[in-house]
């Protein structure tokens, strides 16, 4: 049985249920509430109140998402793109990526180690394959080049 979202209380309760499961951004929460049949007016009212009460926080959502995706082996470019697709402000995303405290060189090393077991490329074809994989994961090309050529990543 689905809940009818025609009152501010029902919209707020549904939003809080969604937030209890995990952090959400405002755009994502708006989309989910709209899919459940809530009006834009009721959604705005509920989300404004949740934000005032500190229950809805873009900063917390960014931090949580960056931590989750970086732990899954993704780099800053991929995470930035995913957050952009979710409707978050590019400036806020860039600031959150700078402030997150993730050691991207370590994450790159971990992703490479998991996929290739530390085997450096032995020919141009395998180098291109490893480079494509790591670039697709969202790591910067200069870091990938340093890793694959065996140079130190401590500068990052």
Curated annotation (Swiss-Prot):
The keyword S-adenosyl-L-methionine does not apply. Modulates RecA activity. This is Regulatory protein RecX. It is found in: Cytoplasm. HAMAP family: RecX (MF_01114). Its main location: cytoplasm. Keywords: Cytoplasm. It comes from Pseudomonas putida (strain W619). One of its GO terms (biological process) is regulation of DNA repair. Coiled coil: none annotated. GO terms for cellular component: cytoplasm. PANTHER family: REGULATORY PROTEIN RECX FAMILY PROTEIN.
